Amino acid sequence: SGGVGRMLQQRFEVNSERTLLSLPSVDTPADVLPADAQLPLDGLDPFVTPNGDFYRIDTALVVPQVSKDSWKLVIDGMVDNPMELTFDDLLARPQVERYITLSCVSNPVGGDLIGNALWQGVLLRDVLEEAGVQPEATQIVSRSIDDWTAGTPTEVVMDGRDAMLAIAMNGEPLPARHGYPVRMVVPGLYGYVSATKWVTRIELTRW
C-alpha cells in the first residue's frame, strides 16, 4: 500500500506542477489555420485532436510522473560537445509552434491511432548543432525515463522539418500521459522511430 500511496502522491504533485507552469512566449508561431480548415461533415474528426482524445501508445504500465525540477536531458555519443540540459534551459531557448500529425505504425485505414496537435518546444536541430554532431553519426537513439528507446535517422532531424523537443500540446503543458515534461516530436515519421515520451537521453551513434 505504501508504493501505491507514493505513486498517487507523485501523480498529484506532477498534476499540480503542470497546473502552475507558465509556458514561455512563442518566438515562431504556427501558421494561422484558415477558417475552412474544419469541414462541416458528420463523423469527421476535428483538425486538431483534443489532448484527451489523442492516442497513446507506449510500454509504460504506469504513466511516469516526472517533475520538471528533476528532469534532465543528456546529449552524448558522437558529438563534439556533450550537453546536459534542464527544463529551465529549454524554457530559455527560442520557442516554436507547429501543427504536427503523429501516427502509430499499427494504425489501420480509418483507425484512431493518429492525431494532429499544436506542439510547442525547441527545435532539436538547433540543440544538436550546438552539441556538434559528428559526420559519421547517422542515428539518433532517444531514451525515455522508463528505458524505452527509439532509433531515428539523424538526417531526418536535421533536414529542416522542425523536429522538436516539445514541452506543450495544444496550448498547455504536456499531459503526463503524453510525455510531461518533455518529449520528442518528428514530423513525417511513425511514433515508434521518433516520438519518445519522457525523453532523458539522446545519443548520437551509427546504424
Provide a role label for each language-model segment.
Residues 6-207:
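Structured, non-membrane catalytic/scaffold regions adjacent to prosthetic-group chemistry
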